[in-house]
Amino acid sequence: MKIIKRNGSEVVFDISKIIAAVTKANNVVPAAQQLSKQQIHAIADHVQAVCGARNHAMNVEEIQDLVENAIMDTGAHEVARKYITYRYVQGLKRTHNTTDDRILSLIECNNEEVKQENSNKNPTVNSVQRDYMAGEVSKDLTMRMLLPPEVVKAHEEGIIHFHDSDYFAQHMHNCDLVNLDDMLQNGTVISGTLIEKPHSFSTACNIATQIIAQVASNQYGGQSISLTHLAPFVDISRKKIRRDVEAELKNLDVRPSEEKVSEIVEGRLREEIKRGVQTIQYQEVTLMTTNGQAPFITVFMYLGEAGDNQRLKSDLAIIIEEMLRQRYQGVKNEAGVWITPAFPKLIYVLEEDNVREGTPYFYLTKLAAKCTAKRMVPDYISEKKMREYKLSKGETEGHGDVYTCMGCRSFLTPDRSGNGWDNIANAKNYDGKPKYYGRFNQGVVTINLVDVALSSGGDFDRFWKIFDERLDLCHTALMCRHNRLKGTLSDAAPILWQYGALARLQKGEPIDKLLYGGYSTISLGYAGIELHHPPLQTPPGAVHRQRLYL
């Protein structure tokens, strides 16, 4: 005879466990109210007989109900009460927070799993430990209460991977493209303080780093900004510097040529750009967010974003050049040695203006290549290929959109509305064109293709059957992510939803309209390897290669 355990598995009925449980309850009541050994064995025999008479395997809860009733039938009400209490306590132990040991090991720096989990975090630092402690609580809630059992089981068995469960308890999204242009041009609010349009490039850079830190503290994934959104402030600084220079020269009663004045202005401007870029570089590697780490930030460098505005494009080129030069140099560590900083990541776009010798900005591409050879950044995007592949509604091949990834990997899908979804985010820089800045990713789930392949035993029909079953699990898990964000109020992260980073919704307004219609994305990843193997019917010596792309 078998019974069904709480985890769903079947085991052989063991009468000794019933005897032991009743005996424990019996031993804590006064002697006058105790059951005899014969009575305890009779209760166990009765339960065994009832279970044996059933035409199906009974589960543990049903059996415990039988035990309670049998004790009550003997008139041993105090023993029954103690048994019920024992049962309740055991239930609490099963459902109680199971994170105590993990949290204690975190605090004492004995948790090897956490030490190896994230190279961007130092688990010995108090601020990081606080984030990890909160993460352990979130993981526990997620696995015990928030996710369906089949998803938890699949995750624990490695069939799928439910990413970032340490943040799932809160209503947080993954990664995004920050609408820095809207925030700088039209103002924002940081920690209850109104931040108006900056009046210089260096101030714009400083505000940008504050925005980045605030955004990073309200999501768990990476973010990307564009240097194009900082470029308009170069000319603002240029004009301000020119006014200052002219005033200084007037006070000195000096009248140099216009050419000399322009030379002085451009020299001071270059110094300001250098300081501004340095602010971004050093702030990003020294800022500490509530996640216990520096912001995961990508900087996008695309001359084509300046359009036909040659002044803006020229100023953008100066910023890009300075960004590449400083990244090539690196930053000093505590020993004073120049090293490669982890952030910001850099993305450089190859385009007609910079891709070959003789083009106006080829010098930037050579500098980028030199930087990559030494610092492994920037990464590169082909404008030509993106315009072929990333087609928003109404666009044709070769005339698509060019934009960066969100953080390090995930790309938004093209704008299926073709017009920025009629500005449902209420952005103040809406222009009716395809929209990317201000959009985001809801979360990620990964399917383990290697496990699918191994489980199939080399049978391709079985492979696809298992693959479809696992995809159904992934869909269930992804819908959990989507549904977790539904109903989230803009008040949960004002910098994101109210003050321009992603939207300018009203206070108390749900973000739901941004979760549908392709405005935001949700990601299915895959873990797999490329296998080289000879199939059963391949002639000896022949090489057969199977590739699977999702």
Regions found by a protein language model. Give the residues of each.
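Short, hydrophobic beta-strand segments
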Residues: 45-52, 297-305, 310, 531-534
